[in-house]
Amino acid sequence: MPKYRSHTTTHGRNMAGARALWRATGMTDDDFGKPIIAVVNSFTQFVPGHVHLRDLGKLVAEQIVASGGVAKEFNTIAVDDGIAMGHGGMLYSLPSRELIADSVEYMVNAHCADAMVCISNCDKITPGMLMASLRLNIPVIFVSGGPMEAGKTKLSDKIIKLDLIDAMIQGANPNVSDEESAQIERSACPTCGSCSGMFTANSMNCLNEALGLALPGNGSLLATHADRKQLFLDAGKHIVALTKRYYEQDDVSALPRNIANKAAFENAMILDIAMGGSTNTVLHLLAAAQEGEIDFSMTDIDHLSRKVPHLCKVAPSTQKYHMEDVHRAGGVIGILGELDRAGLLNRDVSNVLGLNLTQTLEAYDVMLTQDEGVKQMYAAGPAGIRTTKAFSQDCRYPSLDTDREEGCIRTREHAYSQDGGLAVLYGNIAADGCIVKTAGVDKDSLTFRGPAKVFESQDEAVEAILGGKVVAGDVVVIRYEGPKGGPGMQEMLYPTTYLKSMGLGKSCALLTDGRFSGGTSGLSIGHVSPEAASGGLIGLVQDGDFINIDIPNRGIVLDVSEAELAARRETEEAHGDAAWSPKGRERQVSYALRAYAMLATSADKGAVRDKSKLGG
């Protein structure tokens, strides 16, 4: 029978000092026999996805206490990628994921907590906490802050839905008036919550449902809706039961590595491909799998991407549907239901409720369940009122979207495309692979050939795009923006957005060893591995070189002879210590970022630390 970790600090005369300090936090004699459960919050006033979380940790803690546990809350940092975008702040975004994972490990191990409830929401916070959960392998339940309501505005006598990306595109479009741009800006992000499309934050929160570590509804139920409160209460109640299953019943199936196992990771990736999720999810799933010592790699993702259809199309791939519409159609469980009926899922998986996949679908799939309470939960909709408060409204749709032929979620037979929403491409310029969000690529751009326009930084590329130096047919190559080369693997949302603003969104491609925001669409290929700073071929591309992109056949090739590439490599390596570094780029890089770069692996490994350099 496993021993409660917390007994290390609460039992025995030699722990009198520790108990004295525990008493100073409010614990009593009765508490020293109970499980100590960490409530890992991420409240901050910097991030709309987290601005409403201040009191939600207390809500979870009270339920833990009522269920027989001891709750101790602490906070992690949280970076808003949208606010950090387009300037030096974005260098810190991906490295913050490692800091979050480490800080959770530090706090939980230093104080010998028995289990965790992770209150996450936005881009790097959910992955960082997921990495920590699989690293620690103690009972955990995730409950996120929930999606933002979609913005709405009236243009040309028509009400349209908006999100952050619309504000960015219009802000850079010279043909849009200042008044119209300001109107869109004020309407795009109306409430607290993670940005309303299938961007990185919402993608990861959906994947946590598929991994089995979050409760049904977690990925899609709006942050503002009163129903979301029940998820927090249930998380507090169920974590105590989950903890006791492991420590008092020796039930190892309660541990995250046994819930989020290889089969669950495959299901999560299948979901991601089917819903056209953010390309960042590939990076984060690979990183989390390494923390959990799970054999899940780019090879698995490539295999899955070839057989999974695109069943759910959401912003930024369409303006018609946002997360509130996904929820109305049945949320994550609704998509999983269609994938299961298509015979694409591993059924031998479970979740934190102890339910297997069949039981979960019977209880929560709106196409199967007879539970009116579940149907009512999925009818939860937006109020259209600007607010930063959680659970502030109780509006409902008059009916669910169960149209699986032309609705938000489709059956395999009526899929948006029989090819999934993500693809892994291989070729000489990406020997270890690269990623494209095919859900956002125009059908006419699935094969593309064009001359390279090479830039040593995102900033240089943005200046060229807005300055008219990029023309239709070009392949914009942005290099030395990978985990080491950036450092920090910046998101390239501004270059892709500005290509659209300049009317080039469907006539240019973009290739980078950096990454993209979940809000990116168009022929945007990222995560090129190996990166330029690691000697990758992308570092040898010259202006005018032709690049062939073939998404249907999963290929990407730099059309330059082997002899010429060998000569270029010899020339580059002759620079010695200055080899494989950006030419003429001026960028202030702090010691903290340099430390990250020293240990970072390329994107095909999840951009995690190179354990071989740490003796691991």
UniProtKB/Swiss-Prot annotation:
One of its GO terms (cellular component) is cytosol. It catalyses: (2R)-2,3-dihydroxy-3-methylbutanoate = 3-methyl-2-oxobutanoate + H2O; (2R,3R)-2,3-dihydroxy-3-methylpentanoate = (S)-3-methyl-2-oxopentanoate + H2O. One of its GO terms (biological process) is isoleucine biosynthetic process. Keywords: 2Fe-2S, Amino-acid biosynthesis, Branched-chain amino acid biosynthesis, Iron, Iron-sulfur, Lyase, Magnesium, Metal-binding. The active site is at S517 (proton acceptor). GO terms for molecular function: 2 iron, 2 sulfur cluster binding; dihydroxy-acid dehydratase activity; hydro-lyase activity; magnesium ion binding. Homodimer. This is Dihydroxy-acid dehydratase.
